[in-house]
UniProtKB/Swiss-Prot annotation:
Listed SUPFAM superfamilies: C-type lectin-like (SSF56436), PR-1-like (SSF55797)
Protein name, per record: C-type lectin domain family 18 member A
Taxonomic path: Eukaryota, Metazoa, Chordata, Craniata, Vertebrata
Region called Disordered, residue ranges: 47-88
Gene that encodes it: Clec18a
Cysteines joined through disulfide linkages: 324-337, 339-348, 415-520, 496-512
GO CC field: extracellular region
Subcellular localization, as worded in the UniProt entry: Secreted
Location of the SCP domain: 139-270
Example of a GO MF term: carbohydrate binding
Species whose genome carries this gene: Mus musculus (Mouse)
Length: 534
């Protein structure tokens, strides 16, 4: 690149943002516009972010913070982002994150940069895969930065490296000039909820850790109290990096040419992914509070390294302090008893007939699961679908939050009477969105029933004696869990599960006679077949 060349970065939006790059000697770039920030700026910004216990005025740092033109992009969009360089187009491989041709000073970690003196670099001599040391440094950087968020996070989890996610990231980085996403379904242990951070940089201009610092520097523009990014800025890389419930990380780097310019694609994959929004409002990436104060039961330990500002939730070394009765088997990884037939309860200490007209009888639940279009205790009542009462939709399913309170089985019957079931939360995505929504309801919504006892909400999970485990109302096994720290703990008496307001709406086992509000769910397969009422 000689002289001054203009890059026009179009992301398929109405606005096109110019950024003029100049070469000042070998392998040194600067930018005239604040839309593209240097790696040195990013590192300085990351270091300038307030640390818990050392708050700094956010306004002081905003002037030097990186600003990006892609703040209007929908984080949940499936439309591939596009970028243009020298009037030639290429497709970034990210759909939910932004692929940015950034600029910066050369990284000392790379030594002599191929192509720095102006000749075309040999990509075959460039190491494409991350070494074990680089992977360790990237993971360490993520955990260190996650421990430095401000305000401090009460539920931030420690991340572990995933080779399967790293392979996904390598594959996506290799597709530098295409919008095709790797097949997530072929990756063992990961569902489709995978988050992405993608960055395209001039070759040799940055190490991977510096790119991670660049993403974290976007936090200067993020207002956690409003769950919003500053005007004319993007924070999508930052919010995914510090998404509290993302616990698995894998990254990849690949060299490539973009319009004859040597570039590097930096990609990180996160599971479970984040950056969800609800009714156009983005969900906050973590819960504010004292470090590790809202860890779930699965990650009840608190990890803090020497260079961490705060603690991160992790799996404790000795998670179980219990035993199972009546020949029950204790699963150490889940801290749950698997009971012999005929026994149930948390410790297998508890030793149920209903005629179902239009439905199936579930022995574990001692109740009916109604066919589509029918409700009531015996599934004998034909019901119409209440389309107008959906409070929110998640992945096609309808969720209704009750204004009144009832016992668990009273709530179950009321949902069933409308043709639905108590909510089944089977992924981190649904948990995050519901917790965010209920948190806003807590201060804005009025309860019509004045005798409710708590601000908690029943979901369709109960402890089944015959199965010696928690099961959903439909009888399905509970594969996803979000129990609060120290829960479940009611020793067989709290067999029903609620979303607990005081624990950031993580789960708590509760006595089924407690009066709570509740959440009804109508699956897409149900209302797509529903017969309209008269």
């Amino acid at each position: 690149m000689t002289g001054a060349e203009e890059w026009k970065l179009s992301m398929g939006l109405e606005d096109t943002v110019p950024a003029r790059l100049h070469e000042h000697g070998e392998a040194s770039w600067t930018a005239e516009r604040s839309h593209v920030c240097s790696i040195r700026q990013a590192n300085d910004s990351a270091g300038a972010l307030p640390v818990a216990g050392k708050p700094e005025p956010m306004a002081r740092s905003l002037a030097s913070a990186p600003v990006s033109p892609w703040h209007h992009m929908d984080r949940g969009s499936t439309t591939p982002a596009k970028a243009r360089s020298h009037s030639a187009s290429y497709h970034c491989p990210s759909s939910s994150q932004i692929c940015v041709p950034g600029v910066g000073s050369p990284s000392a970690g790379y030594g002599d940069v191929p192509g720095a003196s102006g000749h075309r670099p040999n990509l075959l001599s460039w190491p494409p895969a991350l070494s074990r040391k680089e992977s360790f440094l990237i993971l360490t950087a993520h955990n260190r930065l996650r421990s430095r968020v401000h305000p401090p996070a009460a539920n931030m989890q420690r991340m572990d490296w995933s080779e399967s996610l790293a392979q996904l990231a390598e594959a996506r980085a290799a597709l530098c000039v295409t919008s095709v996403t790797p097949n997530l379904a072929s990756t063992p242990g990961h569902n489709s909820h995978v988050g992405w951070n993608v960055q395209l940089m001039p070759m040799g201009s940055a190490s991977f850790v510096e790119v991670v610092n660049l993403w974290f520097a976007e936090g200067l523009q993020y207002r956690h109290g409003d769950a919003e990014c500053a005007h004319n800025a993007t924070c999508a890389h930052y919010t995914q990096l510090v998404w509290a419930t993302s616990s698995q990380l894998g990254c990849g780097r690949q060299p490539c040419f973009v319009d004859q310019e040597a570039m590097e694609a930096f990609v990180c994959a996160y599971s479970p992914g984040g950056n969800w929004d609800i009714n156009g409002k983005t969900v906050a990436p973590y819960k504010k509070g004292t470090w590790c104060s809202l860890c779930t039961a699965r990650v009840s330990g608190c990890f803090k390294a020497w260079d961490h500002a705060g603690g991160l939730c992790e799996v404790p070394r000795n998670p179980c302090r219990m035993s199972c009765r009546n020949l029950g088997h204790l699963n150490i990884s889940t801290c749950r008893c698997h009971c012999q037939p005929g026994y149930t309860g948390r410790y297998c200490q508890v030793r149920c007939s209903v005629q179902c007209v239009h439905g199936q009888f579930r022995k574990e639940e001692c109740s009916c699961i109604c066919d589509v279009g029918y409700g009531g205790a015996q599934c004998a009542t034909k019901v119409g679908f209440p389309f107008h009462t959906c409070d929110l939709r998640i992945d096609g399913d309808c969720f209704m939050v009750s204004p009144e309170a009832d016992t668990y089985y009273g709530a179950k019957m009321k949902c069933q009477g409308k043709g639905g079931v108590l909510a089944q939360i089977e992924s981190q995505k649904v948990q995050d969105i519901l917790a965010f929504y209920l948190g806003r309801l807590e201060t804005t919504n009025e309860v019509t029933d004045s005798d409710f006892e708590t601000k908690n909400f029943w979901i369709g999970l109960t402890y089944k004696a015959a199965k010696d485990s928690f099961r959903w109302t439909t009888g399905e096994h509970q594969s996803f869990t979000s129990f609060a720290f120290g829960q479940p703990d009611n020793q067989g008496f709290g067999n029903c599960v609620e979303m607990q307001a005081s624990a950031a709406f993580n789960w708590n086992d509760q006595r089924c006679k407690t009066r709570n509000r509740y959440i009804c769910q109508f699956a897409q397969k149900h209302y797509s077949r529903w017969e309209p009422g008269p």
